[in-house]
Amino acid sequence: MKSKIYSSEYMKSSSKGQRWIPAFAMIAFLLAFPVAELILMGKWNERSYTQSQLSYLYSSLWSSDFLTMGAAVAAVTAFFAAVSGFWYLYSPRKVDFYHSLPVKRSVLFLHRVLLAVLYYLVPYVIMEFAAVCIGAARGYYSLSIMKKALILLVLHLLMYLLVYFSTVLVIACTGTMLMGALAWAGLFTYSIVLAVMLQLSGHLFFDTWYEGSYGILAAVRNLGSPLMVIVSFIDRYSSGSFGKQLLILILTLFIMAALSWMAFCRRRSENTGKALVYTWMEPVLSALITIPSGLGIGLIFYMIPEDSSKTAWWIFGMILGTILVHGILEVIYEMDFRRFFRGKVQLMIFGGVVAICALTMKMDLLGYDSYFPAYDNLQGVVINVSNLSYAEQLCNVEKKEDGIYKIRYTATSDNSSGLLDQPVMKSKALYNSLKDIRLQNEKGKKSGRRMYVRYINKQGFSVCRGYIVSSAQAQNLMEALYDEQTWKEDRYSFFQLDKQYLKEVTGIFCDGDIQTLFEKNAEKRQALAEALRKDILENGGQTVKDQPCAMLMFDYAGIPSEGYMDEWGMNVPAVQEGERVSTSVLVYPAYKRTLAILKETGYPLSMDKLSVEYIDVYYFSSEAAGEDDEVFSDTEPISDLEETDNGYKVRYDKKEQLEALKKCIRPSQLVNGWTIWNADATMEVVLEGQESTGGDSGLYMTFAGEIPDFIKADAKAAHVTEWEVND
């Protein structure tokens, strides 16, 4: 019987009623491979890509798109194959029949696995071969494509088997369809929901919570379910560094295969019909579900009210969630509503664990917010200041040995990538600046802008934190960073691009105008870029104490690139004629070489050079501030307030007023991001001989320094409530 069960005749006979699975796989892989390939090729042709771009896109298709689409089809097919092959375990009559056959369960298990592999492999190989042939007909055939196709075959088979064995494990451990469906959903989504709950808890209870995913949280999310193991592998595969994820995928597959085989072979037939065939699993599942559910439902109630009753609602939600979820599980286990309150001792234990977890978060018993490493135990820090210094648009450039450049735009978001791709630094000034920021956050500082730090200790472990930073703290931090040579070299690495690729330089000056510089003088443009590079590297942190006096934008073209990831995280293919890169850099008064060249243009590099006729400041009143508000009732304006539709306007035209305002205003592009005033006010600067257009003259400026007292008084009289620097 053992040899007969693997015969082709028996395989054909036992596949009756399951032939729809390979038919489904054939159609699904037809859509995922050949049809998708033809659609994408049509779109590429519409966009008139060059041949080198098309080759890059076709190679990426096999490295990325086919991997994702094939994985989705493989997962769905694996689910259908597992359910179709082991569905009989939910029927006592069929269980008695199959398990009474003179065949070992292990042999029966392997027989069904072999059928499932055949259901998958035959359609897959046919459709993948068709996709290769389509590419070859379009001129894309190469040994590298064949290699990628073979690799995809192996990878998709691993993913297929992982989902297959995971589904079989669920079916083998459960005795009813309801419990099987719930357990399958839990196995594949539990870690995702748990990670979201942990992330939300950290955001609500910890002031220095880091929004990215790393360490234990990343492990829970990425390794806690078969689905996320596959997704994590796909995310890393296109980058080329997927060895670790591949080992995790294979290890998880072996674990699921072994567990499903053991669960099937040791399953007691008489337990069919029970919620869980292995009753020892009931308290384990109850703990894994009840405790997080109690905490999660408590968080929902915690977020509903806006007043001081949040804590009371939070406690109520945790109690309700713990009792409700535990009772529902007991009803499912026993299939009897009267068993809702079964296991009262267990419920009390779970409730105690929920209370301990909640108390730990609320009182920060683990010291999350107070964490700060000792200087001697610190290997270095990585800082993401994209939220503080957003005026400059920069990119990281790395020159390869063959003259090809690798381009990566500087992280503009506050995710983990902004802490992984930047240099590691260590200095006393930087350490003291971060220490001051941490102390202010410990005191409950809630206003300012958020920045992210990764501390790396000497043992190689990383700890990430997010801090709220005031304008003064940001100033100290940026000064410390500009003293770090490695940080500046990385931040302004685009200067490594060969001078021949610099095609245009544009400047923004103190009058707000945008001017093209040295349009017909390539040597002058190159000299300006070199002067700015030297000024940045040779000047330290004292440089950024002053406000910028200009911004220079460098446009490069014809760069030989291996393809790059843009600021939106999209892969951009390399092109034969080269890539384009645009950057913008602030120019400070300390940059003497750069200013010497810019003075030749005659454009204003100081507000003192502007002949201002008058300045109209528009104050936008708070809707909550009425005319009888006590805060404003005794405030008298220094100037005449002219009422507008949404506030007041004041025109300042006296010499002393204009001179005072010149010291604290700049075009919005020429302001350090960390010193912009968040005020409900805007201004229009009208130069001599220029007519006002009612706030739309194009010469918009913003506050960027010490605000004169007469402006503060008028703002208060105009009911301006938002009147702080970054705070």
What positions do the PLM features span?
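Internal/C-terminal transmembrane anchor helices
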Residues: 286-293, 329-369
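Central hydrophobic cores of alpha-helical transmembrane segments
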Residues: 180-191, 319, 342-354
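Function-determining sites in protein domains
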Residues: 343-350, 360-727
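Hydrophobic alpha-helical transmembrane segments
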Residues: 1-90, 260-268, 299-309, 330-345, ...
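Transmembrane helix boundary and interhelical loop/hinge segments in multi-pass membrane proteins
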Residues: 82-101, 113
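Membrane-interface alpha-helices at helix entry/exit sites of multi-pass transporters
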Residues: 104-116
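Terminal transmembrane helical anchor/hairpin motif
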Residues: 39-62, 193-280, 295-315, 368-395
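Secretory targeting signals
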Residues: 59-60, 67-70, 115-175, 179, ...
